[in-house]
């Protein structure tokens, strides 16, 4: 079972609807319980998400497979961000993965084998692919300048674009759009996003002129661009640790 499998296993039955995942509607009892819990619990981790970014991503083993992604960002400090990734920003989104974002300084401290798993962000910002929905460019400029110098590691755990009604198989490593043939986002996908938010990616390029990427771009990031090799996850059986942790 690998993240590059076209079909990792038996798919849930498809009924021709767009409902993901399959299941019965919430009962009134469940709705009341959810509302009560929301009033009484702090939900502190969720409330730390303070920024919404929308961009695109390519599968690490097949850059021709591209998806729109919505990142909800929690900034732990100036050098580290953690993001919940959804396939849309509607009231019924699907949580499809997580991305960690680190500063150039932290990225350079990583082992080269670890660096292979990370991607840069400067191209998607400079070309207007990454946007801050409903936030004016002038307001977002400083944030975009900061993110352009960072690196990200994005694991996709639910391939809804493939039609999976449930999260199936191994997680897939995702990569950012790049200025190479397979890394350029398909026009139809771009138009759909722009129409949804009433923006023009092409016109954003002008306002992004002068935004710079990392001081020294590391070639271990965006590994598929520089080395022509994709990366996939495989799941194998292994012997379990049979010694008890306590006497």
Swiss-Prot record:
Q: Where is this region: Disordered?
A: 1-26
Signal sequence, renumbered to the chain: none
- Pfam families found in the cross-reference section: DUF1264
Q: Which family does it belong to?
A: Belongs to the OBAP family.
PANTHER family per the UniProt record, alphabetical? OIL BODY-ASSOCIATED PROTEIN 2A (PTHR31360:SF1), PTHR31360
Its recorded name reads Oil body-associated protein 2A
Species assigned in the record: Arabidopsis thaliana
């Amino acid at each position: 079972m690998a993240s590059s499998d076209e079909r990792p296993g038996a798919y849930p039955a498809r009924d021709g609807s767009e409902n993901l995942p399959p299941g019965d509607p919430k009962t009134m009892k469940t709705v009341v319980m959810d509302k009560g819990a929301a009033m009484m619990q702090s939900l502190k981790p969720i409330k730390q998400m303070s920024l919404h970014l929308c961009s695109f991503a390519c599968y690490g083993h097949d850059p021709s497979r591209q998806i729109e992604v919505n990142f909800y960002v929690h900034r732990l400090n100036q050098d580290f961000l953690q993001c919940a990734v959804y396939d849309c920003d509607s009231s019924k989104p699907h949580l499809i993965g997580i991305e960690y974002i680190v500063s150039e300084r932290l990225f350079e401290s990583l082992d080269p084998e670890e660096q292979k798993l990370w991607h840069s962000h400067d191209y998607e910002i400079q070309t207007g692919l990454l946007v801050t929905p409903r936030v004016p460019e002038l307001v977002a400029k400083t944030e975009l300048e900061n993110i352009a110098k960072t690196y990200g590691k994005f694991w996709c755990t639910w391939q809804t674009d493939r039609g999976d009604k449930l999260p199936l198989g191994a997680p897939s490593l995702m990569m950012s759009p790049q200025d190479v043939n397979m890394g350029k986002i398909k026009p139809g996908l771009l138009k759909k996003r722009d129409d949804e938010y009433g923006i023009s990616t092409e016109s954003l390029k002008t306002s992004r002129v002068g935004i710079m990427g990392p001081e020294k771009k590391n070639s271990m990031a965006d590994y598929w661009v520089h080395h022509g090799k994709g990366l996939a996850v495989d799941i194998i059986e292994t012997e379990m640790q049979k010694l008890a942790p306590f006497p």
